[in-house]
Amino acid sequence: DSGSVARTERVVPMIAIARAMGASFTIRQNAYLVGGLLGMSPEELTEKLPSIIEFADLGNYLDRHLRGAPTSARQRLAWSIAMAIDADVYAIDQTLVVGELEFRQKCWSAVDTLRENGATFIVSSDGAKQYRRFCDRGLYFEQGALVADTTVPRALALAREARREPRGE
């Protein structure tokens, strides 16, 4: 079987976007690179760059190479760019909200605001805490087939049960 899905919403794939950055590029160059990959125009990036850099707290590093910036700079910049995009859906992974406590709190606040404004988050994570934080609906799949469209706690319970059951031959 095959098929397709047509979406009119703007989707921001935040999964592994920080890996696209180049260590020999400056923070500014990486912002344009990643923003462009996520669908932002150069004009949109130029307009939003000050708020992106402020959110990421990377103002002192703007024209430095990424390799000379703090180790968390890559993730902070990626997160800040994604949050600057006016999207309907954000697909994120478990490694996205990293870094210092103050930055993580800023990220969670941004997520809460986006959710209050109707944004949808598709989350891929090994940790139940991430699902509880982002999701109010749980989809549980087995071998590519939807088994349950339920609450997050119930979907997590199904996943735990499946891991405990012996695998068939």
Residue ranges with predicted function:
Residues R104-N117:
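Helical segment within the ABC ATPase nucleotide-binding domain
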Residues Q143-G144:
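Conserved ABC ATPase "signature" C-loop
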Residues Y32, T46-Y61, S80:
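Conserved ABC ATPase "signature" region
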Residues D1-G36:
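ABC ATPase nucleotide-binding domain signature region
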Residues S72-A91:
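GG-anchored amphipathic helix commonly corresponding to the ABC/SMC/Rad50 NBD signature/C-loop
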Residues D149-T150:
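ABC ATPase "signature
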Residues R133-Y140:
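Conserved catalytic segment of ABC-fold P-loop ATPases
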Residues S125-D126:
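H-loop/switch region of ABC-family ATPase nucleotide-binding domains
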